[in-house]
Design a protein with these regions (language model features):
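Surface-exposed acidic loop/strand-edge motifs in secreted or periplasmic proteins
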Residues: 45, 52-123
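C-terminal motif of bacterial Sec signal peptides marking the signal peptidase cleavage site
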Residues: 17-20
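Short, well-ordered, aromatic-rich surface patches in folded extracellular/luminal domains
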Residues: 23-43, 49, 110-180
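Bacterial N-terminal signal peptides that target proteins for export
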Residues: 1-9
Length: 180
C-alpha cells in the first residue's frame, strides 16, 4: 500500500474511535432519585401525590406540593429540579432495604433500553398514575426518567420482562403507605 493510503486509513480509524457527545445516563452513588410513583388528577379539583425512593432506600411522600418540577416530554429533570422536589417531600413510614434497593435498581438499565406500548385513552376523571425509574448523568447534571407503566385515564407499559416486577413492588410500597 502507498504511504498516503495508510495515513488516510489511520486517520479514519482514529476519528471513528473518538466517542461522541452522547448523554450517558447511568446508575451511580451520586444519584439521589431511583423510582417514583406519581398520581395527577385534574377532575373534581386538582390532586397531585406520590412517592419517591431515594438512594438510601427512603420512601419520600408528597401530597399537592407547591411549585413541583415536572419532567419535560422526554422525562428529563435537572439535578436542581430533583433537589427542589426532594425538599418538598416528607419521609414516609416505610423504607426499602439495601438488598431490595440493589435488586430493583439493577432492573433500571433493562427497563431503560426497552420500548413502551402506545398510549391508550380508556377513561375519564380517574387521573393518571405513572411508575417511573430514573437514571442520572453526572456530567451534565440531568436525570432521565423511563416510564415503567401508566394507569388511569391513559394506559401504556414498558415491554421489558422486569417491568411487571417493579410495578408490583412499587404497588406493594404504595399499599403499605396507605396503611398509615
Amino acid at each position: 500500500m502507498k504511504p498516503s493510503i495508510i495515513k488516510i486509513l489511520t486517520a479514519l480509524f482514529l476519528l471513528a474511535s473518538i466517542p461522541g457527545c452522547k448523554k450517558n445516563y447511568i446508575i451511580n452513588d451520586e444519584q439521589a432519585l431511583y423510582f417514583q410513583f406519581d398520581y395527577v388528577n385534574h377532575a373534581w379539583g386538582y390532586q397531585h401525590s406520590g412517592f419517591i425512593i431515594d438512594n438510601e432506600g427512603s420512601v419520600l411522600t408528597y401530597n399537592n406540593p407547591e411549585n413541583w418540577n415536572f419532567p419535560d416530554k422526554d422525562l428529563i429533570l435537572s439535578e436542581k429540579d430533583v433537589e427542589e422536589n426532594l425538599s418538598k417531600c416528607t419521609p414516609g413510614p416505610v423504607a426499602v432495604t439495601n438488598d431490595e434497593l440493589k435488586k430493583y435498581t439493577g432492573y433500571i438499565r433493562h427497563i431503560a433500553s426497552s420500548k413502551v406500548t402506545a398510549l391508550k385513552n380508556i377513561g375519564a376523571d380517574a387521573g393518571t398514575a405513572q411508575f417511573i425509574c430514573w437514571q442520572y448523568s453526572p456530567h451534565i447534571g440531568e436525570y432521565k426518567g423511563y416510564l415503567i407503566k401508566m394507569e388511569g385515564d391513559y394506559t401504556c407499559e414498558n415491554l421489558n420482562f422486569y417491568s411487571k416486577r417493579v410495578v408490583s413492588w412499587m404497588k406493594d410500597i404504595h399499599g403499605n403507605l396507605d396503611q398509615f
